[in-house]
Amino acid sequence: MGKVIGIDLGTTNSCVAVMEGKEPKVLTNPDGGRTTPSIVGISSSGERLVGQIAKRQAITNPQNTVFAVKRLIGRKFASQQVKDDMNVLPYQIVDGDNGDAYIELQGKKYSPQEISSFILAYIKKAAEEYLGETVTDAVITVPAYFNDSQRQATKDAGKIAGLNVLRIINEPTAASLAYGLDKKSDEKIAVFDLGGGTFDVSILEIGEGVFEVKSTNGDTHLGGEDFDLLVIDYLADEFKKDQGIDLRSDKMALQRLKEAAEKAKMELSTSVETEVNLPFITADASGPKHLNVKLTRAKLESLVSDLLDKLEGPCVTALKDAGMSASEVDEVILVGGMTRMPAVQERVKKIFGKEPHKGVNPDEVVAIGAGIQGGVLMGDVKDVLLLDVTPLSLGIETLGGVMTKLIEKNTTIPTKKSQVFSTAADNQPAVSIHVLQGEREMATGNKTLGRFELVGIPPAPRGVPQIEVTFDIDANGIVSVSAKDQGTGKEQSIKITASSGLTEEEIEQMVKDAELHAEEDKKKKELADARNNADALVYATEKSLKDLGDKIDASTKENVEAAVEKLKKALEGEDVEEIKRLSEELTTASHKLAEAMYQQASAEGQAGAAGDPGAGQGAAGGAAPDDDVVDADFEEVKD
């Protein structure tokens, strides 16, 4: 078994780590960064861009650049969260054939799983380059409060990227692993995880290598992106007041505003005031317009006060579900870039009554924990036991549209639970099992995970047939449900792949597309390399021709010039083999030039030697015998 990488697939940034010996190590990407922007762009030529390069072109290509795709993964197009996002995101969100939210880029529809797979494939390749070996196995993190559809969709994204996802692990749990791996004493900790798009809080008991999650809560649609939107609105409103122009209707200006808002928010974590300057943000008949707005930390905090208030509820619920008071929590671990904001830290201090622990890197700690979990699965990390929980209750719809819970939220996973139900009408030949996830009393208020039928029930009065329904949750938090007629032994089961989600066929097709794209990338690189080499060869040859001028014979010059022209023509096309063949021809023809240059240099050297001052006299004087010269005898004198 090769290395198992741990990936934090974040809303804003992603990070990858691996166990090297006994230590987890964050791997750098080809740009040298320890985190990679979770951004994908499709250029006008159809080229796929991921990470920093996609971020750099976002301003000029906002409609074909996707960020924050994690907020859409596993969600229905008709859901309120997607509707909210459609109002603020510059790219087009469309209805998929299965009812999921899809994204349209350059006229083609992509599922959020596919977009996420592009980021994962980039990270996989970066890890392979760093480690110098092929990587197939991975642990991927998700927000603790992700439902089954979102977990399954994340696993599918990994599969499309060519990864064997060994485990889906909750982000706060991963962070606790990174924090507590070397801790020997027992501790009760709270992990407060506020990232780019999601918010989680988990309460754990850790000690002696056991990490037991007692409860988890959160909001999968609350994070840094929401804070940014409020700053964007403020900047746009200020500009409208000043210039009478609403920048929100201009997608390019909106993208510049987004970048400026994010930067200002980050700057205000360390300073109390910043200035947002965006020259040439737009123009009207009177000429170009510039945005210049001062923003103070106090103003930012007043803008986002409602979001700060939303952080309290999940913390209080998590403590209550864990059966703990805030004073019993020994440490509060801050995770996610948004926890750098002083107002967030103050709110955490107020909720838990203590200063939060700032000893971990909030951007990297989740990936490090995932890397450690990879080490556990490989057997490299010993004596670590992870006991996670299911974040939401699971059950089925029963008579009257009620949700009957079989597995309560915060139940330790993996787990299996059965309950016997019966028919609601006389001689009922089949039962429809409607699988639900959530905390509401009525079925309509909860998330539908799937439906299936158990047929062939023998005629009997209502209440007589015994139908055993079994829920099974694996270590990834992914659900399977079965129903069995105890009278006939007939059984029907379903592995929940979400009521929509991607089918196996769609996933396989996307895997093939990804492999095809990798092959295309390889061909593009080969073409680029061949072109670069050919360009360099043409330049060097033309320079040599110019330098030699008339010092080479006409036929050699003609042959070389013809070879140059042929190669130049080939460079206009995309035939790699033709470019390589003509490059070789030009190299062979250029050898004649090299010979001519060598001969010229040699001739110049000889001519130079012949023309040295006094050389002729010296040669004549030394070579010609002189009749007047007499050879001298000598005798050795001994004392």
From Swiss-Prot:
Q: Show the ranges annotated as biased composition (Gly residues).
A: 611-621
User: Is the keyword tRNA-binding assigned to this protein?
Assistant: no
In terms of Gene3D superfamilies, this protein maps to: 1.20.1270.10, 3.30.420.40, Actin, Chain A, domain 4, Substrate Binding Domain Of DNAk, Chain A, domain 1
Q: What is the native source organism of this protein?
A: Desulfatibacillum aliphaticivorans
Q: Where is the composition biased (Acidic residues)?
A: 625-639
Endpoints of the signal sequence: none
Query: Low complexity bias: where?
Result: 599-610
Q: What is the lineage of its organism?
A: Bacteria, Pseudomonadati, Thermodesulfobacteriota, Desulfobacteria, Desulfobacterales
Q: What induces it?
A: By stress conditions e.g. heat shock.
Q: Which SUPFAM superfamilies match?
A: Actin-like ATPase domain, Heat shock protein 70kD (HSP70), C-terminal subdomain, Heat shock protein 70kD (HSP70), peptide-binding domain
NCBIfam families for this protein: PRK00290.1 (NF001413), PRK05183.1 (NF003520), prok_dnaK (TIGR02350)
- Protein function: Acts as a chaperone.
Q: Where is this region: Disordered?
A: 599-639
Q: What is this protein called?
A: Chaperone protein DnaK
Task: Give one GO term, molecular function aspect.
Answer: ATP binding
Short name of one Pfam family for this protein?
HSP70
Against InterPro entries, the record matches this protein to: ATPase_NBD, Chaperone_DnaK, Heat_shock_70_CS, HSP70_C_sf, HSP70_peptide-bd_sf, Hsp_70_fam
Residue list for modification Phosphothreonine:
T198
Q: Which family does it belong to?
A: Belongs to the heat shock protein 70 family.
Keywords from the named record: ATP-binding, Chaperone, Nucleotide-binding, Phosphoprotein, Stress response
The family database entries (HAMAP family) matched by this protein are listed as: DnaK (MF_00332)
